[in-house]
Amino acid sequence: MTTHHTPLYLISALALAVSQGVHAQDEQETKVQAKQGLETIVVTGVPRRTTIMASSSSVSSLSLEQVEVSTPRSTAEAFRIIPGVRAESTGGEGNANIAVRGLPVASGGAKFLQLQEDGLPVMQFGDVAFGNADIFMRLDNTVQTIESIRGGSASTSASNAPGGIINFISKNGENESGSVSTTVGLDYDSVRTDFEYGTYLTDSVRFHVGGFVRQGEGPRETGYTSNKGGQIKANLTKDFENGYVRLYYKHLDDKSVGYLPMPMYSNGDSIAGFDAQSDTPHSALFTKTVRLNGENQISSGDLRDGMNPKVDAVGFEAVFDLDNDWRIENRFRKSSISGNFNSLIPAEVGSASSIAQSIGGVGATLSNANTGEAFNDELAMRIHTFDVTLNDFGSIVNDFKLTKSFSDDTSLTFGYFASTQNIAMSWLWNSYLMELKGDNAALLNVTAADGTEYSENGLYAYGTPYWGNCCQRDYDTEYDTRAPYVAFSTKLGDVSIDASARYDSGEARGNYAGAVTSTVDMNRDGTISIPEQNVAGIDIANASPVNYDWSYSSYSVGANYQIDPSLATFARISKGGRANADRLLFGKVRSDGSVADEDAVDEVNQFEIGVKKRFDSFSVFATAFYAETEEQNFEATSQTFFDREYEAKGIEVESTYFMDAWDFRGNFTWTDAEIAKDALTPEVVGNTPRRQADLIYSLMARYSYDKGAAGVSFIGTTDAYAQDNNDLKFDGYTQVNAFVSYDLSENLNLALNVNNLFDTVGITEAEEGSVPENDIIRARTINGRTTSVTLKYAFN
């Protein structure tokens, strides 16, 4: 399968320069390749299977081979080559911020975009605090294709997905294939083995099984094995004359470090002793934390757990063609999800003496918590632990669909979607002091001028008093969603028309509790230290109820005009919605558990018009779009609520070009977005939403030769504002990735991959909106250069 991207003149020039060595391919084969892209069959977000050329939606399909060119180090990095999608993948293996077509990322996660596996949502809400959907999924060799749909047609295809859908479609044994590969980091600590195999057991029974295991420190220095675990997925299919039944299983237990904003200068330069591209505040000298758990019992947390999703999912899929042109489909999944999210965020980076005196008073000093030696550096960090126990994020999802075909071109679909999503977690945060250092930083103790100790082993507070003890919290909630929907499609001559509607309703039930302080002998030594005088725990006795309902209607109407076999144009108008979940708590939920109707749901209105053109070896897919978005949200790191509206317009272009053994792909998205209304901070009205660049792009070239392939990708962005006040601005950047592979034998391949070849600095987010007096900000950047080698054996 292929996708289509903007032609890249730079890569074209490179191709011409080296084309003397190209092994010429048959001209007809090139034409077939070019045609195949727009004729690719897609199933995600459409009422019935269709081709990209015939669809009135913006859809794309990526194979693993196409993803390989961008050399992703995480699942979210693979999303960066999808047109219209802005994936801030600097959080590690998960915890990415993902936006689509100017729809905002006001807090984190992927609020208006749904991530799916085999047609069902991984999480019903894509922006759960510390539970972003990408944390609970992994890209490996069990994936056949990554399909995406952008724009309003997703509004009626899935609940809470008005901006789009990204769907991982698994291999199912239909084509016998298998492989085992091991990838080793050459300049970073990582070893990963992937495996997969699928085939027919009988003429009508087939299976596929695969997954990965890995271990290592990862692309940044943490001082310990921070990435460890793996995944296994399996499916079994029974084919019948008129359909099939498929069973699924997935087990994921994978620890990976979560990268949060880190200290650097406002221009992206590193601070002495802390490399912004390869260091973290994580340290082998700081791996454990003691706190009160969600039941106010003394317990310990392990920072080495990082983001540790524990997922067990089972499901089935049944599709049958019945008499009288009826077709029935049902997809079901039950997921048990729990785990941890443990990481470190610098709440303050500043003068060591000022931080010490803010805790211990005038004359207070700092010392190394391990050695007791006086600490005389100018800078230090006030660290908060993002210590979150994911008690229950399990879900049950079912999507039923019944279709009546009246002809080859006309069909009517009725469907009913139902899901239950649990969101139960405990925030158990503490406060520490650390030296500003990237290689196993030490914890710091603070001592008053009179010798009084204000901390123990670097901990100066059980809780987060610097943030008003905001973040000792317990959530125990359940969200039920029900959505009947209908879709109609027909063809009148050269014009294909589709219309769909969906009615989402749901209810939120449960309770939540905030912080309360008390005196607790946390280390059980019989004495009460200063930090133990005010220990933050959960105010269980005064938990607040969650008891609200929501409902909203969605529609989407589109038309595709096939002007000739190689040219088509389309248009669409849509209205969708997004129910708000956990981020309403501690702010928008009333004392009786109810929520105002306007806060419960955010609506999105979208308009798009596009054109698709195919030449012998070149194809282009261009879409102009406009969106109006409502937003209610809450951000944990800044303790900020949002209540605003956005407007965004832009152009999305996707194209592909084949030339002999060369395969060129690229896409770019130009977006002009602004904050149209803001009920809480009206001074930002008219400003550009934070982190929204005017232009994002992905450009790739792949060259295939007799014994392998080589490729290069350019992934970049123009400059963007750090925050909505539009003061501090990040520079744009282009990240270059490259790979080369060589067949050692018929089935044995060796590949070299380089991510961020030129060690480019690229900032994706920052906590500060303006440059502080000391010029130090807390930001996330893309990782520095990492190089790996993969040995892969294919048995097929």
What function would you assign to each model-found segment?
Residues 153, 165-200, 209-221, 713:
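Short strand-turn segments of transmembrane beta-barrel domains in outer membranes
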Residues 226, 237-239, 244-315, 340-388, ...:
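Acidic/polar loop-and-plug regions of large Gram-negative outer-membrane beta-barrel proteins
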Residues 393-395, 405-421, 426-430, 434-440, ...:
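Structural signature of Gram-negative outer-membrane beta-barrels, strongest in the C-terminal barrel
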